[in-house]
Amino acid sequence: GSCALPFMLGPTKLGFTDAYFEAASGLTTTGATVITNLDQLPRSLLFYRQSLCFLGGMGIVILAIAILPMLRIGGSQLFRAETTGPVKDTKLTPRIAETARALWLVYVGLNAACALSFWLGGMTLLDAIGHAFSAVATGGFSTHDASIGYYDSPLLEALCILFMFLGGINFALHFVAWKRATGGPYFRDSELKAYFAIALAVSAVVAFDVSAHGVFPGF
């Protein structure tokens, strides 16, 4: 509920229900929004809104696990509830808190790489960071009403696709591949193979439909 306060007290002046919806949408990386005229909002509020996607992307539970041991509270069950896939029950590091921190390191690293790519691709620094938070978390939020289309840049759209795809992969798998300094874990993972096949198939169907209906002339 407290995450909704900036939307209630800030320039958007949302009611409790709408503000709660907006905050929940960000933290769960749903991407639905009730806010319009994003281009007119203060940059501070836009950054806050994008940061909700960043926090929700890896999972606040994982963040909590990293600090729970300091309070002498176990986090193993929370970690297993928050992670998925074949490496779910694999110990990536000796201690669960170290594993949570390692996954956050991978997550932050991807966000940094994405933000740098967006910035070099022509975005302002705020937009680069904000869209990185959203892309890696697959959260769907943007700092513009036109979303990534605001820039009308095939390069930025391609970068966004790339980092959204990477963000959709099991972060434990990213960590294992990084730790072993090899891409082997990616090629052996059945979950990733299914993910890639589904993404490719759905993309092909959508591209065909868009082309058939002339949504983008010249496509």
Language-model segment annotations:
Residues 1-219:
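Membrane-proximal intracellular helices of multi-pass ion channels
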